[in-house]
């Protein structure tokens, strides 16, 4: 694959992250980001993660995980999903 291309494992890792309880996501991500900016307490962790997720567009990925798959037996196909707000 091309460098920088998305792979199926990227989507599985994303699903794994967003299927966790929110406090666990917050703790896990904030601990990985300590080298970017020192944060103390859940509000500062949340602020840093919100900015990063907003920049990365990750808020839409959480919505995609809520969509029920109607054809679970079909071969996976990578598509763009645009969900209504």
UniProtKB/Swiss-Prot annotation:
Belongs to the herpesviridae UL91 family. The gene is 30. This is Uncharacterized gene 30 protein. Pfam families: DUF717 (PF05338).
